[in-house]
Amino acid sequence: MQQRVIISQDIEHDLAQAITETEHDRVFVLTDDITQECCLPKVAVLLTKHNATTITIRHDDTNKTLATLADVWTALQRGGATRHSLLVNLGGGMVTDLGGFAAATFKRGINFINIPTTLLAMVDAAVGGKTGINFGGLKNEVGAFANARYVIVNTCFLDTLDTANLCSGYAEMLKHSLISNAQMWAEHVNFDILQPDLAELQRMVAASIAVKEHIVADDPHEHGIRKALNFGHTIGHALEEFSMPVSYTHLT
């Protein structure tokens, strides 16, 4: 199933349309404790109209575990979810990765919608069909390829994001420009991510997503050209380990 990416100008309108166009008997929304407070209010009225059940997990990648996944399965089960239910993942990459995997495996697969709320999730984690959890001390060790029905991208969520997380996502956009073209690279280098124009950033995010979508369409399961999207991971992770404060998330 191919996912549809919506570059949204009106998050409530676009989410309402996506929910309406996706078969469902019940709606569940997965957040973490931060996005529940900072991001859920932007769509809360709409989700209330659909009698959505909220499932909240703890933030941070250290909680992207089998235990947390089981908590989500349990919440879906207790909430009466069926094969025809819909899960809306509202959060950063941890939420979209784990929520996508929960949806891909619960009842052998239910529909889900991703609403990424961090810049990195917008241009990377929420798009492309990779879902998963950490396991045995290894990142994304267990997972599945499963496309969201919709990925709804709106930079309105970035107004609460700190500088470190903005830079983390922007580094991924710089990588996309390096494997795309010189004009895109020049535009990205000259953009002020520390004082971003969110409307302009949204246009750039759309272009960055298009780079990833083009590659993923040719190699959905990462047997060949899709490995280009991992550009910088090998040396980047080592550099991060030795040069960054442990409180910072990754920049590659």
Regions found by a protein language model. Give the residues of each.
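Conserved small/polar residues in nucleotide/adenosyl-binding loops
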Residues: 249-252
